[in-house]
Structure formats: C-alpha cells, structure tokens
Amino acid sequence: MSKKWLSVMVLAMFMLTLGLAGCGGDKQQGKKVLKIGTDPGFAPFEFQDEKSKEYVGFDIDLIKALGTKMGYEVQIQNMNFDGLIPALEAGNIDATVAGMTIKEERAKKVLFSKPYYQSGLIVAVKNDNNTIKSVKDLEGKRIAVQIGTTGADAAKKIPNAVVREFNNAPEAFMELKAGGADAVINDKPVTAYYLKQGGDKDAKMVGDVLQAEEYGIAMNKKSTELKTKMDKALDEMKASGEYDKLYEKWFGKKQ
C-alpha cells in the first residue's frame, strides 16, 4: 500500500471517529431536559444543603417528582428571585419553582400551574420587642424584606415605613438580628422554619397572617403544552398520596 493511500485511510478513520463522537453528543443533547430556575435562599422550599452542597427542599423534591412523571431530566439553576420572571420571558429557563405567589401582576407575564401550596405573610420581630404586636404597629418602622416578593409589596404599603430589600430571606433575618430593622415581613412557613432552626433565640412571630397566598410553578407565556403536562402531573401526585408524603417530610402532617 502506498504512503498516499495509507494517509487517506488514516484521515478517513479519523473523520469517522469524529462523526461517531458527534453522534454521541447529539444523543446526549437530545435528552428531554427541564431547566428550572430557583432562588435557594427560601428554606424549607429551596436551599443549599451545607454538607452536600446540593439544592434541597420541598419545591426541589416536588419539581423533580413532577419532572419524572413528565419524562424530563430536571436541571436546577440558581438565580435571584427578582430575575426569575425575566429569565422565563427570555427563554433562558423553562419554569421556576421558588415559592412564587400567584398574583395578577405576575400572571400578565407568565403562565402559572395550578396552586401547589397555600401560604401567607407574617411579621417577625426581635424577642425583646414588645411594642410591635401586629402589622398595624409598623407605621414609620424599618422593615426588612426579600426583593421582588409579596412581602416587599406589603411593606411598601405601610405609611412612612423604611423598607430595606435584600436578595434573600436569610439576609433579611440577619438585618433584624443585627438591629438594622425593626421587623421582617415574609412568608409564614419560611419564617416558621427559620425560627425552628434556631432563629427563635433572637426573633418571634407576631400578629395574624396578613394575607392568604397560593404558590404556583411559573412558565413562559407560550408554554401552554408544558403547563398542561405540569397540571396533570400535579393532579396525579395529589391523587396518589405522593404530594402528601413530600408535604409531611418538610412541614409535618397537615393541621
């Protein structure tokens, strides 16, 4: 065999190897992937485990279970809460599960799944604060909130209040602990979890729930097919008892 033909055969084998490798990559890329945006500073719904560094929580377990039912591989992407809806609108993610309250203003921009959790806002203050007993006592006070949330919306409606916005709930509670805020307005289950994890040494909840809320999984306005699949999978989880098991894992039995 001439050197010329040998060179041609080597080149052909090399190109074939590249082609096969390319096919493998296409197959990998062809997997049905569901890109989920979340803000992992909202325990017990989504947060980063200190040991494993994995994202865990009720929302994370829920979306993974829903993804399995729909035949998707779920990929979690960490982003700030106020960047979730813009990311959906831009098509950078497929859905977001982040303890997001279903409200009219948001529903103009995104599609929501059926409600998957009932929540509400609550006020938290330092243990030695006996002057703030409800939201009515917050006029003119310094209030720490998470940016872009319904808690922030509620705080901004309080006359003369100084609203301090933070990227996540833990930062808001740290501001309260440090004395930079007189109160925190946040979702009750998140506040209750914070207190349960040791925050009760410094803080307490006061007053009644400010307003009832429902969480939904948000999707791009054009993702009508995904919404249909998501709602169906959620119904199946509730009917089978799988949803209740996840609920009890993170919140205990329903009262």
Each predicted region: which residue ranges?
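Short helix-initiation/N-cap motifs at beta->coil->alpha
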Residues: 60, 75-88, 130, 147-150, ...
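A ligand-binding cleft/hinge motif common to bilobed small-molecule-binding domains
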Residues: 100-108, 154-156, 177, 182-212
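Sec-dependent N-terminal signal peptides of Gram-positive bacterial secreted proteins and lipoproteins
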Residues: 1-26
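Extracytoplasmic small-molecule ligand-binding "clamshell" domains
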Residues: 30-99
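Extended ligand-binding regions for polar small-molecule ligands
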Residues: 60-69, 147-149, 216-254
